[in-house]
Amino acid sequence: MGLFSGSRPDNLGFRDGKFAPPPWKPNCVSSTVVKDDKHYIPPLPYSGSAADAWKKLEALVAGLPRTHVVTQTGQYLYVEFKTATMGFVDDVEFALDEKTSAIQVRSASRLGVRDFNVNRERVERIRSAFAAA
């Protein structure tokens, strides 16, 4: 992959309604931590059909630049994003949560400590595009 790609994490997945807990580093956001946690970011709400919302998300994410879809099922999506400047790889997970009519999300940098809000801003851009689509 590249000098700044790092290794794929071994704790990926959505189990018991949660993603893996964020590391101590501030370079991760997750919708499945408690709301007062510094890593918290709200999930992506949807209305209407869960299947339609999921298809919309899959299409949106697949069209983003520097994106590699690794795992895609009917309720879980794992994507590697490569940053524009240095080519750092970030791991982003989405899970369809029909109980809450939301898509849960976790975005984390593989390397380094700080990400200068890259992961949070990416999720917010996806949220805006998802709401507008």
Predicted segments with their positions:
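Ser/Thr-rich, low-complexity intrinsically disordered terminal regions
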Residues: 1-133
